[in-house]
């Protein structure tokens, strides 16, 4: 779970206790009648993770009544939804590693990984049914955006489309949308004022974009498995990222070999090593960090409309923790 050192002691104690409750609920709810399904679905749960999304739900609930029993369920719903998409993403990307452990598709094959993702969506839906029709509607709208974002990424930009703008749109739909749902659930299920909920949703979508852009930087810059994935994973898969798209925009004569490698998946490990070294020394990496901080700062500014209290300070700390991952 992400550490927020600047939280007030009171907010930190409360958040830690409720996050522990989410963790127990998440692990228990993944269980089913078929032991193998329980094993595969708990694979990534047990691997850990930052738990940004349920944490965001819990923090948002502090603007209303955070003791309502639906809040913990909502936090588990968003994390189960996120986990399900990871199983599916790893199949599409043929990723061997997730959260520092062997991916489900690598261990059990694509069919089991896909079905495990479906299973987690089903388990999420069971909880969602207890949250009311509005919660179901917003989950469906968010899921539509997630899928459309994935389709957009798979299809790629058309003709003269701005490749960077297309990518930011993909990130908004795939990552920003679920962050927004987290805040919406925490806000409106706790009975927060509608204007507060709206502000929290907009803040969280912007935060979600910054979160993914930070991951793009980490994929290039980390020398270890900082992101839980093998460094250079996106390069191996030929997936465009903020850093590689900026290299295209800021290309220099000496980048000819790098640009050739970035035009598709990089299969040779020697070429991956070369590309990572070239990207780490390219001015595009610094620009990617600047853009990431710009989105995080945009999210921070939205918090000016919220009451200045321990929870708002916690959301500010979340922004700082996110940016520090890529700085």
Model-predicted segments: where are they?
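All-alpha prenyltransferase/terpene-synthase fold signal
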Residues: 1-327
